[in-house]
């Protein structure tokens, strides 16, 4: 518990209790904290304030200040005897992307700028991406989860075949995978870990958006472990800046027409992406950089300057453009937000 951001109580003076074992008040008065002098017509009130460790924040309502009542119970004005809880901070990388230097050849070196980025390895040793959205859950694509499996393979049989890494090659165990109920048209799935991961400089979830950031021309950042220009899987996490594209132009590019009877059966790269109301497209960067095989499951991360927070606007679904096609395709996170929240709450 301590490693995962356990609550820390600071004694102002007087008495303190063991925060991790309950709400029993224990006399801790000694010479290091002498009893304060009394004043006429006044009284002394014992108070503690709870804080969370670095990379965690108080989730419970109230200000974290507790006073000792006449029954020797610590209580908060808002929450009563209920102890506060700490949750992981999201979308606040210690080394944000604008502090990272571009390296030769247009490749981008991400030194902890994308702590939500995870690497997933299939049982056929194929690399794909996943995105940490809280201490125990990740988003990825349904296609990633099914890599090397038949379409009718059950989720419970898929989970044990996957290897997942966060931070600096820290392997984490998967408890279960859950597919979106309409995963043939919504290419998304959730991964639940057996244990919560400790959040730190290298491991931090990205925030889920409460509003839609997908506007044509908006630039997002996509990191990944996918194939490089030589079509080899990279050993170093890279990222690229990509603009949101016009959806109608993207549909016309891959399908030939927005009129169903005029659609062509084949896209310019030989594989047809899923394009519907749950998706959006992003084009090439101004340096003609792009995502490629193995990057799917990574977030289209946008930085909201108003609250200095990073949000996952999309999850890369179609990663086969590799600079040979004009657009990558992403699942729009706001369109699946209710499903994400309900699924996590139910599991």
From Swiss-Prot:
PANTHER family: COMPLEMENT COMPONENT 1, S SUBCOMPONENT-RELATED (PTHR24255), HAPTOGLOBIN-RELATED PROTEIN (PTHR24255:SF27). As a result of hemolysis, hemoglobin is found to accumulate in the kidney and is secreted in the urine. Haptoglobin captures, and combines with free plasma hemoglobin to allow hepatic recycling of heme iron and to prevent kidney damage. Haptoglobin also acts as an antioxidant, has antibacterial activity and plays a role in modulating many aspects of the acute phase response. Hemoglobin/haptoglobin complexes are rapidly cleared by the macrophage CD163 scavenger receptor expressed on the surface of liver Kupfer cells through an endocytic lysosomal degradation pathway. This is Haptoglobin. It comes from the Eukaryota. Tetramer of two alpha and two beta chains; disulfide-linked. The hemoglobin/haptoglobin complex is composed of a haptoglobin dimer bound to two hemoglobin alpha-beta dimers. Interacts with CD163. Interacts with ERGIC3. Residues 1-18 form the signal peptide. Residues 31-88 form the Sushi domain. Gene3D superfamilies: Complement Module, domain 1, Trypsin-like serine proteases. Residues 103-345 form the Peptidase S1 domain. Keywords: Acute phase, Antibiotic, Antimicrobial, Antioxidant, Disulfide bond, Glycoprotein, Hemoglobin-binding, Immunity, Secreted, Serine protease homolog, Signal, Sushi.
